[in-house]
Amino acid sequence: MSQEFDYIIVGAGSAGNTLATRLTEDAGVTVLLLEAGGPDYRFDFRTQMPAALAFPLQGRRYNWAYETDPEPYMDGRRMECGRGKGLGGSSLINGMCYIRGNAMDFDGWAELPGLEDWTYLDCLPYFRKAETRDIGPNDYHGGDGPVSVATPKAGNNPLFHAMVEAGVQAGYPRTEDLNGYQQEGFGPMDRSVTKNGRRSSTARGYLDQAKKRPNLTIVTHALTDRVLFDGKRAVGVTYLVGDSEERVEARARKEVIVSSGAIASPQLLQRSGVGPRALLESLDIPVVHDLPGVGENLQDHLELYLQYACTQPVSLYPSLLWWNQPAIGAEWLFNGTGIGASNQFEAGGFIRTRPEFKWPNIQYHFLPVAINYNGSNGVKEHGFQAHMGSMRSPARGRIQAKSKDPRQHPSILFNYMSTEQDWQEFRDGIRLTREIMAQPALDPYRGREISPGAHVQTDEELDKFIREHAETAFHPSCSCKMGTDDMAVVDGEGRVHGMKGLRVVDASIMPLIITGNLNATTIMIAEKISDKIRGRKPLPRSTAKYYVAGDAPVKGKPMREVKQG
């Protein structure tokens, strides 16, 4: 059985759905969109209710549930590496934090050969094109894009405001918009949530526009086996449907576009014969093209939580108690309001820990409850926590296919905490977080430090806590990087070096990880490259101003000094 389309897109995630929607705006263009997972069931509260964000990570229906190899600098821990499965990809299971990265990230990309048109001002029009912000557009934000973005509102949890004030009292800037003129500092955090309180995945935002178009064919439960080649040209794919072992073939007249994410995209290329020769030969995979960078340069964000007891009954602890959950669910289901309608990450911040960092190297998410991100180990009392993580670790990992079998997960190694900079940033980060948490704004709420605990003070004690408790922020990227050097996989338009009719478009093509959550930037990348594929002129460069710290001090004098070990 064979079918023919102009474009085949492998992966209906944040990038794939964006591409499928934009390419099929041209009525004469046919697109096949393949997704290994199932539909984004709209009546499943686990993916649709923002406050239920921990649930999809606990099962396998919506989560690939990858695990790393034993991480050598983390006491040999096998670390969780959840990725979204189903229409929407990781936008179906992520934390819905709408953060774009720092302007300097993109200006840094644009300094690399071949990526000159990836400056922040080149990218900003595509961020705006993708977005509808609930309080309206401005120079930084869009008003009629597919991604619904909600801003924190008056009357939300008082802990959000106290934590932002504490950051300012500790000597850091205040910012009104982490995606606007100035990322650096503390302020309210936007989220990818609709005005009706539903998750704004790319399945909802993009595919809802496109799925009824006659020129778009969507196949779910379709696991792509490999890309087919005629010489160095990609001409199609084979895929498996459900549990079947029968391979279905589809042909691409123009291009095969791999949008399977930073774990699966390099794995698919390797299984198809595009990758490091030695690896392919060791797996008995015929080499179509020796491309050593496929699966290399893997990057992620690591984070940990500092948890505190809350002395006033204002945290979300009661919402964890089963007898309170039916009322929360009913208010969300029928009104789209209440605790269920927010991811509860409504405040955050970005800071520099040392003067040598030209832009922030630490991100904060504040949460008005003490619990693990995946919903486990909830503290049995009122509490709150700060998620703290480093943004641009020098650590580099890799993805390697283990066999030709598309159902076998690849070997994943991030090499977390493999450099001295990593340890320095996390030690600094914990100590600076404690200083923030000790400021007067939190006096009405702050109880004892639950985790790590006030007794954990020395470098050695902090390092032990980091090794045992740091977790992924679920931001794998950069494993098929853009560029022109020997380890680059694609050019600045996502075209695979040395091949024809083959692109990669997703978070794997970032050359360097960004400062913040990845989803908004992944969508922007797909918006930008879709114009290239369609032969359209790029959107005019923005003229918006943006903050550069320059010689500004890392922080001012804190209102309350804290002595630490």
Swiss-Prot record:
Required cofactor(s): FAD
Gene giving rise to this polypeptide: betA
HAMAP family: Choline_dehydrogen
Protein name stated in the entry: Oxygen-dependent choline dehydrogenase
Active site: 475
Organism field: Pseudomonas putida (strain ATCC 700007 / DSM 6899 / JCM 31910 / BCRC 17059 / LMG 24140 / F1)
Entry keyword annotation includes Transferase: no
Binding site for FAD: 6-35
EC number(s) reported in the record: 1.1.99.1, 1.2.1.8
GO biological process assignments: glycine betaine biosynthetic process from choline
InterPro entries: BetA (IPR011533), FAD/NAD-bd_sf (IPR036188), GMC_OxRdtase (IPR012132), GMC_OxRdtase_N (IPR000172), GMC_OxRtase_C (IPR007867)
Any single Gene Ontology cellular-component annotation: membrane
Keywords assigned: FAD, Flavoprotein, NAD, Oxidoreductase
Catalytic activity: choline + A = betaine aldehyde + AH2; betaine aldehyde + NAD(+) + H2O = glycine betaine + NADH + 2 H(+)
MF annotations from Gene Ontology: betaine-aldehyde dehydrogenase (NAD+) activity; choline dehydrogenase activity; flavin adenine dinucleotide binding
Pathway: Amine and polyamine biosynthesis; betaine biosynthesis via choline pathway; betaine aldehyde from choline (cytochrome c reductase route): step 1/1
Task of the protein: Involved in the biosynthesis of the osmoprotectant glycine betaine. Catalyzes the oxidation of choline to betaine aldehyde and betaine aldehyde to glycine betaine at the same rate.
Family, per entry: Belongs to the GMC oxidoreductase family.
Superkingdom per UniProt: Bacteria
